[in-house]
């Protein structure tokens, strides 16, 4: 299984003062291969440590921590080495599997927890790294009407420290968005 990380190598520039996006120029391509059945189906990437660290979220329910090596000039990726494979727990304290493993997006909260949005069994859970202790952000039934393969698709940290989650398909032309400011429920 392999995943292309060409997206991580793109440079985005805006034309000075015009507000018009310039053409994207690829800086290079790297084909990432890793052993194991859990690798692949990557839904989200988070690059940190000044470009030397990576968290990758798989829709198969695994989170990969990796180290990125680059060419001497600091640009082109030369190697990505998985240093840890983590398996989140579901609401019952069991490793995610089947219907409960469809992870779509992640965001690091101001509390340092990694928050993961799941699509099929729609939920958002915070996890302590590296032990993956689960901290549900809502009750078991909160998002039951969204269960299936059209649940959460995007998750981000807001400037005020809260989280925003967006549903995959529009409802009446608008994308349902949920906001969380801590606690045990989400506002729509």
Tell what function each PLM region has.
Residues 19-188:
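Sequence/structural signature of beta-propeller domains
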